[in-house]
A protein has these predicted regions:
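Short, compact, well-ordered microdomains
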Residues: 53-83
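Catalytic phosphate/metal-binding cores of nucleic-acid and nucleotide-processing enzymes, i.e., regions
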Residues: 1-47, 58-64, 75
Length: 83
C-alpha cells in the first residue's frame, strides 16, 4: 500500500511497517496521551489545543522513538503493510 493509505490506517490504531525495512520487528504506530517526566520528577502531560497530544512512534529492537519522521523514500514507497 502507499503512504497515504498507511497514514489512514495509522490513525485507526493499526501498526504498520515497510517491506523494505531491514528489521522485520520494526513498525510504526500512533502514540497518544503523551507525557514525560522532567528533571524534578514531575509528570508533564503534553496535551495542547494547538498541537494535540499524538505522535508517530517507531518501535524497533532498540526501543521506541517518539516523533518518528518519514523519509522521502518512506513517503513515496508502495511497500507499506499492516503488522
Amino acid at each position: 500500500m502507499d503512504f497515504g493509505k498507511a497514514i489512514q490506517l495509522l490513525k485507526e490504531g493499526k501498526k504498520l511497517q515497510r517491506e523494505g525495512w531491514n528489521g522485520k520487528k520494526q513498525y510504526i504506530e500512533l502514540a497518544t496521551n503523551i507525557s514525560y517526566q522532567n528533571t524534578k520528577g514531575e509528570v508533564i502531560n503534553a496535551e495542547h489545543d494547538e498541537i494535540g497530544n499524538k505522535a508517530i512512534a517507531f518501535v524497533g529492537t532498540s526501543g521506541v522513538q517518539i516523533g518518528w519522521l518519514a523519509s522521502q523514500a518512506d513517503m513515496l514507497a508502495n511497500d507499506w503493510k499492516e503488522v
